[in-house]
């Protein structure tokens, strides 16, 4: 209980959360709770799989381990995953580069004009949903803050904006700008 309180305090203070997972044990319930807190707070996140030096490996080990982590922490598909060894120093220099990248992405600002071009293109590729004969119209999108990057989408009727279409727009924005290791927030107005 006390460790969770300390973890929450650390997450609150952090720009980037490094979730250290035991490479042998995998994602624990407590790891998932801390990941959820970091996600809710909109923190940048890197999942560091530690003890990689003692894990029995073949040519598919990283792929299988990544899939397991992505399955358990499916709510944060944007998180970066790195396989490290604190004991041997394996890939630790890359971890620091990744921290810098995530901080940069979490602070990234995108011009309204560029966002609206992406939205227009996305709408042309996949029409917005409609309900009872009424179609969703997207007027424009703008970024209102960073840490985490937060976007406001102005629409004709926010009841028509389904979470799956918001996710679709998020994916188009990620395709264009990356936002690696960074949660994105969307407000519908």
Residue map of PLM features:
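C-terminal-of-GTPase-core extension/linker across diverse P-loop GTPases
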Residues: 1-5, 9-20, 24-189
